[in-house]
From Swiss-Prot:
EC class of the enzyme, as a word: ligase
Subunit text: Homodimer.
Family: Belongs to the class-II aminoacyl-tRNA synthetase family.
Protein location: Cytoplasm
GO biological processes: histidyl-tRNA aminoacylation
NCBIfam families for the chain: hisS (TIGR00442)
Enzyme Commission identifier(s): 6.1.1.21
Cellular component aspect of the GO annotation: cytoplasm
A molecular function (GO) term: histidine-tRNA ligase activity
Disulfide linkage: none
Identification of the protein by name: Histidine--tRNA ligase
Amino acid sequence: MQKLVAIKGMNDILPPDSARWEWLEDKVRTLMARYAYRNIRTPIVEPTPLFVRGLGEVTDIVEKEMYSFEDRLNGEQLTLRPEATAGVVRAVVEHSMLYDGGKRLYYMGPMFRHERPQRGRYRQFHQIGAEALGFPGAEADAEIILLAHALWAELGLENVRLELNSLGQPDERRAHRAALIAYLEQHMDVLDEDARRRLHSNPLRILDTKNPAMQALVEGAPRLIDFLGEASLQHFETVKAILDANGVAWSLNPRLVRGMDYYNLTVFEFVTDQLGSQGTICGGGRYDYLIEQIGGKFAPAVGWALGVERVLELLKEQETQVARPAADAYAVVPDASALPVVMAALQRLRAQGVSVQMHSPTAAGEGMGSMKSQFKKADASGARYALVFGADELARGAVTVKPLRDSGEQAERPLAALAEWAATLQSSR
């Protein structure tokens, strides 16, 4: 029978790699709590119109990359989420979450895009994101950027730089759009097929082209920031001033437009040169009109999302050490007849918060194995202590506690006194 394997571009996350994921997620949860962000979890499958309306019909994601299908039960058009912001906004609108003021939310989870798998880019990938909804001020933009910047410090990430731009408001973009189209129409011979297709539908995205033959053209294109009015400029200046006051370095990138149509005013990316062409590890911006587009009352919002795989890849590139989780203790059990007593003792320890791994045979009828082989496995497990439940110890109602990592002498302890040892162990963590 043919062996079934994972879909190309959709990867299993196995130990010990999964420990790196847990470490990152724990760091994020701790940091989000400091900034008063609360967790939200939305469905992986959403109505297709949510993304068409929210992201824009002529975006690459909607045109080329979504996993969409028809529900066989009712004919509804459904899509595996390619990003999470639209789903978070849908949930906020559906459940009237802004009735009593703004909300700070964060999420973690898998996203799906049908694209060619390569380093840092997968068909199932994972994002962590933060959304501040109901806050119109530039301080909200700055705070959410500071949140991401603080995360890099928590993770020990280096060589990550911040790029900023402002997309202004819709009327300012319309004026820039007209000037941009007029400029590009004078250079039709330089435009590639994709740029010609976008010229009158989404010309701003042409500025984000990776085509080397078009780089000189886009460098000379009208800059959106030169079309901003006083209010938009002041908003952007306030964001930059707050970042400066916090010692956060940034650079202006007038070609930064992001891949979704819902952005306005501040947009930003955190980028690195250590991941080749997939150098953006986090991006976001303000999206004041998305809530209204999805059917809610107008409410401002700003957010970002980071690519988990890319962040972990960057940590690996920088050789950041992530502590491998290990049990506090490893139970060495020479005789299977002792298992009822041993497992009762281990359950009491676990109830007190002690993590214990018990040696178990890997094949039927194999037996418990020699003491020597069990001690080898105990040492390889990374546990701090071995708990030896030998026949002599059990006859005395005791267990031998042998340090494997910590200093100190091995000692015999009564089974009834293991609770005291557990309390001492926890206080020494």
